């Protein structure tokens, strides 16, 4: 455990922010730097079958130290950080023995406040690692990376019985490409866990069904003084489209198992406009209904337009709720829950209001629920992680390996 914090601070010092709209994978050079560093560290640790694919997926194996019919299991984290907020020149602050109240982030006016983030009340006495208010931290998911690497070191250096352990580090998870080039067969695990969750105890096996909706609107621009009966304002059509989308089904008005429509971006002129929505829902039927709703809205608003003016809508599914795949293998969750209880942690089963690589991998034949990392407030300047939470995550990973070995002996 002594190197856990050291590893984490080293990893977050590297700018691995991914970039959307880029064809190449990984989308940024910084991710390669961390992947090559991890490859070197895995080699120094003595793991075998270490491969780094041309698409930036790093895999390695810790051989079993006991005999028996023990299934190979995996642990997976992603190396990129979110494009939503700067990940360059991350300058972590370490707050030991947190005593409550506001935490100043750097030398400006930014603070991490329990008024805005009440979870801080539960973390008194712990060591918090925060940002300096200028960048994100990168605990999503470098906390997971550091925890997996530390768990490997623990298993390697202690006589803890375990079967074959597979590990993988993926790029571009934050832009939805992390699992697209993942070779499940080459990985060779019967099941796996992503280490990409939040607070201590979180065990997630349900995530959104997700789709993107791109709308292109072509209008007709003429001089406003002679526009009557001729002008078709693409921006007005965009406004009408958004007015038809249920206002009470947006991210800012929903929680728990509630789905939403989210207008992520909009740009344009009188002549042309573009809108980008994302659709999310846990229920597959409701998910399909939301997609139909968007098509109906576009058809309604576009009715009666001049033939040269039109509304074009393209919907693409991004990923699906992994619940239907994971529940087919209940022992995967049973082992994780038992591991947490053995580490004096109360498992907290909650839905992911988002997605993970594990969602896609579960549909590729690798059931893959999500474990906590001990981090909070991802993708922004208020992101932080607790050292105690990270240590708990390492303990759970090690215990999962041990319990899996006992099942097979």
UniProtKB/Swiss-Prot annotation:
One record GO biological process: proteolysis
Keywords (A to Z) from UniProt: Aminopeptidase, Cytoplasm, Hydrolase, Metal-binding, Metalloprotease, Protease, Zinc
Swiss-Prot/TrEMBL catalytic activity: Release of the N-terminal residue from a tripeptide
Residues the record lists as binding Zn(2+) 2: 140, 174, 379
Pfam family, one: M20_dimer
InterPro entries xrefs: ArgE/DapE_CS, Bact_exopeptidase_dim_dom, Peptidase_M20, Peptidase_M20_dimer, Peptidase_M20B
Subcellular location(s) of the protein: Cytoplasm
UniProt-listed Enzyme Commission number(s): 3.4.11.4
Top-level taxon of the source organism: Bacteria
Principal place of residence: cytoplasm
Cofactor note: Binds 2 Zn(2+) ions per subunit.
This protein's GO CC annotations: cytosol
Residues binding Zn(2+) 1, per UniProt: 78, 140, 196
Residue positions of the active site: 80, 173 (proton acceptor)
Summary of the function given for this chain in its UniProt record: Cleaves the N-terminal amino acid of tripeptides.
Record family assignment: Belongs to the peptidase M20B family.
Protein name: Peptidase T
């Amino acid at each position: 455990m002594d190197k856990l914090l050291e590893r984490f601070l080293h990893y977050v010092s590297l700018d691995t922010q991914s970039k959307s709209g880029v064809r190449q994978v990984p989308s940024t050079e910084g991710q390669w730097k961390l992947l090559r560093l991890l490859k070197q560290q895995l080699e120094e640790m003595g793991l075998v079958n270490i491969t780094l694919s041309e698409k930036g997926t790093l895999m390695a194996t810790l051989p079993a130290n006991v005999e028996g019919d023990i299934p190979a299991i995996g642990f997976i984290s992603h190396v990129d950080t979110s494009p939503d907020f700067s990940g360059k020149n991350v300058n972590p602050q370490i707050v030991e023995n947190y005593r409550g109240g506001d935490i100043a982030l750097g030398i400006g006016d930014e603070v991490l406040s329990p008024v805005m983030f009440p979870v801080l009340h539960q973390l008194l006495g712990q060591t918090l690692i925060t940002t300096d208010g200028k960048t994100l931290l990168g605990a999503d998911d470098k906390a997971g990376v550091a925890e997996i690497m530390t768990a490997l070191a623990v298993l390697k250096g202690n006589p803890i019985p375990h079967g074959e352990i597979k590990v993988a580090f993926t790029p571009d998870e934050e832009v939805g490409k992390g699992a697209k080039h993942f070779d499940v067969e080459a990985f060779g695990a019967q099941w796996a866990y992503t280490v990409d969750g939040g607070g201590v105890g979180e065990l997630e096996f349900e995530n959104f069904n997700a789709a993107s909706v791109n709308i292109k609107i072509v209008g007709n621009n003429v001089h406003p003084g002679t526009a009557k009966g001729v002008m078709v304002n693409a921006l007005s059509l965009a406004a009408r489209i958004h007015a038809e989308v249920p206002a009470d089904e947006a991210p800012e008005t929903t929680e728990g198992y509630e789905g939403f429509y989210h207008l992520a971006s909009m740009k344009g002129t009188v002549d042309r406009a573009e809108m980008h929505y994302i659709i999310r829902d846990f229920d597959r039927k409701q998910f399909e209904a939301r997609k139909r709703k968007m098509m109906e809205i576009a058809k309604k608003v576009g009715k009666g337009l001049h033939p040269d003016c039109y509304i074009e809508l393209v919907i693409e599914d991004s990923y699906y709720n992994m619940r239907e795949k994971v529940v087919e293998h209940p022992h995967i969750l049973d082992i994780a829950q038992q591991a947490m209880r053995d580490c004096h942690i109360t498992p907290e089963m909650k839905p992911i209001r988002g997605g993970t690589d594990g969602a896609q991998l579960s549909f590729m034949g690798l059931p893959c629920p999500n474990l906590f990392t001990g981090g909070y407030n991802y993708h922004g300047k208020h992101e932080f992680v607790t050292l105690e939470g990270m240590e708990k995550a390492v303990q759970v990973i090690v215990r999962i390996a041990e319990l899996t070995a006992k099942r097979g002996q």
